[in-house]
Amino acid sequence: MSDENHNSDVQDIPSPELSVDSNSNENELMNNSSADDGIEFDAPEEEREAEREEENEEQHELEDVNDEEEEDKEEKGEENGEVINTEEEEEEEHQQKGGNDDDDDDNEEEEEEEEDDDDDDDDDDDDEEEEEEEEEEGNDNSSVGSDSAAEDGEDEEDKKDKTKDKEVELRRETLEKEQKDVDEAIKKITREENDNTHFPTNMENVNYDLLQKQVKYIMDSNMLNLPQFQHLPQEEKMSAILAMLNSNSDTALSVPPHDSTISTTASASATSGARSNDQRKPPLSDAQRRMRFPRADLSKPITEEEHDRYAAYLHGENKITEMHNIPPKSRLFIGNLPLKNVSKEDLFRIFSPYGHIMQINIKNAFGFIQFDNPQSVRDAIECESQEMNFGKKLILEVSSSNARPQFDHGDHGTNSSSTFISSAKRPFQTESGDMYNDDNGAGYKKSRRHTVSCNIFVKRTADRTYAIEVFNRFRDGTGLETDMIFLKPRMELGKLINDAAYNGVWGVVLVNKTHNVDVQTFYKGSQGETKFDEYISISADDAVAIFNNIKNNRNNSRPTDYRAMSHQQNIYGAPPLPVPNGPAVGPPPQTNYYQGYSMPPPQQQQQQPYGNYGMPPPSHDQGYGSQPPIPMNQSYGRYQTSIPPPPPQQQIPQGYGRYQAGPPPQPPSQTPMDQQQLLSAIQNLPPNVVSNLLSMAQQQQQQPHAQQQLVGLIQSMQGQAPQQQQQQLGGYSSMNSSSPPPMSTNYNGQNISAKPSAPPMSHQPPPPQQQQQQQQQQQQQQQQPAGNNVQSLLDSLAKLQK
């Protein structure tokens, strides 16, 4: 049994033919045995039982052998799938046949038992012979099975060798492919490293101390954690880090001589926004190292980080006042700016890397930037003087002005922070030498070669948005060259208006805080004198219509019959103006110069208050540019002037309106002033002065010189001479149109003599006869009783106190 088991471990499953033969032999033996048993009926029962036991043992041994063979086949089938499939089919067939043999054996055993029960007389000799035959047959079968198993083992070994060879070849192919992929990846990596980095691979020249300082400086600055830095592109991050390291002398990069070419190319690739076309980057200057941020590229849109800094600047600009302690030489002058398309945002992007900007002013073709220290101004001049901005090189200088800048409140658009806006196109090179000074008397650039048609003055209390709207309406509605000036405390409105009329400006517009405008238009009289018309508290559209009418009349280039114009229907649907008595040709001095503008007749204006100017309504025979019958405290903003009125009896051409003083007065009429005139004279006096006048009038009502004392007190409060006041109380004084227009202005408590509004003309002094008449007038007026005037004054004061 041991030999059979050993052979069964090595050999394969026997072929189906052999198994069938063995089963057939067993069946034959069983048949023979059954036949012999049938013959020998006399055999004892013990022998039969022994035979049965031996047969059962043989069957069990065969089953064990078959089981071992099946296990061997399963193990071999795992190594070779194809062989396993064929062997499994053979095993199934063998098991089916074996099952059939077992069934046959069982049937035979049952038959034998029946035969044994029937035939008890079988012989022992027959049993021994059968056993010998069975042993011989079993030996034959075992020898045949061992031979077939050896053959199957050799076939399986050959198959194993073939499969191993195939596996080795597959492994070799996969290893070769992997090696090729690795080589290609290494080549790509080395190629990318060579393209991107050209730094020297010699690590012996690395300054580890400097590297540690740089790393520590970057980590201590907390720059990497800032959200503004994290949103930057990779190139801008590198440039920002380099700029920060170079700003400190301890962490600045030092380039060895033999590595300068490589390092400069690397830094040039990191700072792609640099404008240098040279391959070699020059060493950084101290000003460049002090830059807080990389230089902006105006060809690209504003970044988020720049937008945040500009928003912070606008927020802080509103809080800056003139009381700040601004160091000297911290104001940068910028010249050669384009006339258009320059904004505060552009200048902020260019100059903010050099220091903290407090304020930006943009004028016409130049501007100013206020830093908080003079070093920032010097750095900006050093770095930006050679750079191209707006397609040209800017003129950068330290501003020579020592005055504090005028700070604007709010950003109202391009150039809104300046004091001057113009629609005229004036080249940068043809301006006067003082055009850069933003602190001159007028606060705007004065050109000696060019005069505009209209000047717009904006009060400090006026709305800038409305002022810009008025400017746009004049520019688009009239087509005239217009300048708009934002008034400042140092500006004298009267001087500005006087200069405008003297320079030939057609008219001026004053923008009020009540969203309306006041207009004064200038024109030449028949003898070359300058006259003016005044319109108070009108809309911007009406002001545009006035200037359009002036434009049309000037384009016609012919004398205008203003009396005839008053008969025509007004273009705005107003009724025709009344025609006063007098000649119908030429510009009479007593007529209103409305030029088709829809103004109510003078009779209607007498019943209306005269606005903020403190002037009495004109009479029916008095032109709009004529003087009032008595001197008034006329307020045009802060501008005040006092001018004697013309005589009503004599038609003399008007001079410079209320800006022109008259010649020696003519003999006045003896008509006393009425109550309305006295009320107009004292309506602007302070309350304490009114009380003093009332008490003095009550005490000195019976004295003959009461009027003179009261008039003297009024003169002292109005800043006029007593002699001039007495002449005005007595009547109208004449004006000489040929005399130059002297003017007495009172602005901020200072008496300033304005320049003449028209070119001076030759004139003769008044004859002695007129001087004698003047002296007689003064004496008669001093001797005149003051009862009626004092009583009227008392009534007027009583009304004012009510």
Swiss-Prot record:
Note: Present with 5830 molecules/cell in log phase SD medium.
Region (Disordered): 1-174, 252-293, 571-675, 717-802
Cited PROSITE patterns: RRM
Biased composition (Low complexity): 22-34, 260-276, 593-614, 651-661, 717-738, 770-785
Any GO MF annotation of the entry: RNA binding
Residue ranges annotated for the RRM domain, each copy included: 330-401
Protein name, as recorded: Nuclear polyadenylated RNA-binding protein 3
Functional description taken from the UniProt entry: May be required for packaging pre-mRNAs into ribonucleoprotein structures amenable to efficient nuclear RNA processing. Binds to poly(A)+ RNA. Appears to act in the maintenance of CLN3 mRNA levels.
Composition bias type Polar residues, residue spans: 632-642, 745-754
